[in-house]
């Protein structure tokens, strides 16, 4: 949220977990698990990228600054958080347009809810999509496998 543009290619060589987030959602406590994964594996080349979105039941209505402060104060978030974006529709951010169309062996599908996660390999290819109900801890084995 520093106002500079970042590309997914900036993270080439890292394992990346991209997540659309919201601060007033039943899945909001997943911030804690995401931060735990980030702290545990960031030194080994893993990063979480958080993209706030207000597209689902207005569950992230705050300003970018308010969202960042909420995440830090309530969940100790230190992983990169970006400006609020749309993940679906004609104004969908290009990162999400790409992600939705790049999951192997899956039809492109719109994001259904907050905390949908995409796992990207070191080569920049999208490997897997996890729906909202999948907790960060449930992804850990996949991350460990990629870090071998």
What are the residue ranges of the model-derived segments?
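Soluble non-cytosolic domains of exported or imported proteins
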Residues: 25-28, 89, 133-134
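Conserved helix-turn-beta segment immediately C-terminal to the redox Cys motif
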Residues: 9-15, 24, 28-52, 71-75
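Surface-exposed acidic, glycine-flexible loop patches that form ligand/cofactor-binding
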Residues: 7-9, 39-40, 104-110
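Short, internal strand/loop/helix patches
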Residues: 65-114
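Extracytoplasmic/secreted proteins, especially bacterial periplasmic and envelope-associated proteins
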Residues: 33-36, 62, 66, 90-94, ...
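Thiol-based oxidoreductase modules, predominantly thioredoxin-like and allied folds used
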Residues: 20, 45-64, 78-89
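Thiol-/selenol-based redox modules, centered on thioredoxin-like
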Residues: 94-97, 101-148
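N-terminal "domain-start" segment that seeds a small globular fold
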Residues: 1-9, 94
